């Protein structure tokens, strides 16, 4: 989750019929319940490998001083840096194909994607996804979220713009297989149900879109809320067994739970304006970052109650989860602007669940 967003928290007075408004009853945990380590400037998304027993963090480094970026390999227990993989292009989004142990990083500024061998740290290849030159009239699509289908060795990448698309990349050849067009304005959210051959995306038009990965065709698109208000469904995470999608909204103080089979809203969970979301099937919980509030929420996915919050100032950004579902990782950004860069590196937090 690496684009900058403005959040406008506001309370909801009324709800759609059949949906739930869930009051937040939670406990706030102190900093001593977490391990926090400074890593590097420009921290964004993470990827976790059970096989390598490692966590990777994409960092864009300094805007002014560094042309490229660094991917850090971290010890998942101590969060100490065990390897620094320097890149001439800045990495932002991240995912891993667990079958091939290939890391994939979105190079947002350059409209490209880079593949890295998780074991060696060697760059396996790179693909420019939108080669158009940026002008006042032309805005190349920018890679945002990445998901890997281990069964087919296919990488799906959301290309964000006024008219977004999803790139479908062959993980073996690192070549573009096809492009799924017309996914709406700022189509950032991306989640995959490999067994069901379904890909889901969300956008700033307030839509939930279902795609058939066998044909790479859009099957359905549904505007989730028809309340006359602005919504930006910025990220989503799936409970594939329960046919649910947890969806964050950067324009509203609630998290939506949607039935992936029909797009119907199952619940509205009261929470601060949100950014990243990650479902944990082991604990039947969902975790959500609230950038402006400086917190991470833990949602009981059975009751839809917010049961815990972690204070994670300044700006909690992205989430990653260990394969056993017992450890949560959070990337946390310091306050930084184009005029005044942060003087301290960004952090990674390890939370024992």
Curated annotation (Swiss-Prot):
Keywords, alphabetical: Signal
Where does the source fall among the domains of life? Answer: Bacteria
Question: What name goes with this protein?
Answer: Uncharacterized protein YncE
Give the signal peptide as a residue range, or say none if absent. Answer: 1-30
InterPro entries from the UniProt entry: Haem_d1_sf, Host-pathogen_enzymatic-act, WD40/YVTN_repeat-like_dom_sf, YNCE-like_beta-prop
């Amino acid at each position: 989750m690496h684009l900058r967003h403005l959040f406008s928290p506001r309370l909801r007075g009324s709800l759609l019929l059949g949906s739930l408004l869930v009051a937040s009853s939670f406990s706030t945990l102190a900093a001593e319940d977490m391990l926090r380590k400074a890593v590097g400037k420009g921290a964004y998304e993470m990827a976790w490998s059970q096989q390598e027993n490692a966590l990777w963090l994409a960092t864009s480094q300094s805007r002014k001083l560094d042309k490229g970026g660094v991917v850090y390999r971290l010890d998942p227990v101590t969060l100490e840096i065990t390897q620094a993989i320097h890149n001439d292009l800045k990495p932002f989004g991240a995912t891993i194909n667990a079958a091939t142990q290939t890391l994939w990083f979105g190079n947002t500024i350059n409209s490209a994607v880079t593949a890295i061998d998780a074991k060696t740290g060697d760059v396996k290849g790179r693909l420019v996804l939108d080669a158009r030159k940026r002008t006042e009239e032309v805005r190349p699509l920018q890679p945002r979220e990445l998901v890997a289908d281990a069964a087919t060795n296919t990488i799906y990448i959301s290309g964000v713009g006024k008219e977004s698309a999803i790139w479908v990349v062959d993980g073996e050849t690192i070549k573009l297989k096809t492009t799924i067009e017309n996914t709406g304005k700022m189509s950032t959210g991306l989640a995959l149900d490999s067994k069901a051959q379904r890909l889901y995306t969300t956008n700033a038009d307030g839509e939930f879109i279902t795609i058939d990965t066998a044909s790479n065709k859009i099957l359905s698109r549904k505007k989730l809320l028809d309340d006359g208000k602005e919504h930006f469904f910025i990220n989503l995470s799936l409970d594939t067994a329960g046919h649910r999608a947890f969806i964050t909204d950067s324009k509203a103080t609630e998290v939506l739970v949607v039935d992936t089979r029909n797009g119907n809203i199952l619940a509205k969970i009261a929470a601060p304006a949100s950014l990243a979301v990650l479902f944990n099937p082991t604990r039947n919980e969902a975790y959500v970052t609230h950038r402006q509030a400086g917190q991470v929420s833990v949602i009981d996915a059975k009751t839809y109650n917010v049961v815990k919050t972690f204070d994670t100032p300044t700006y909690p950004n992205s989430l990653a989860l260990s394969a056993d579902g017992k450890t949560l990782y959070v990337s946390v950004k310091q306050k930084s602007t184009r005029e005044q860069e942060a003087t301290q590196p960004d952090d990674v937090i390890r939370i024992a669940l």
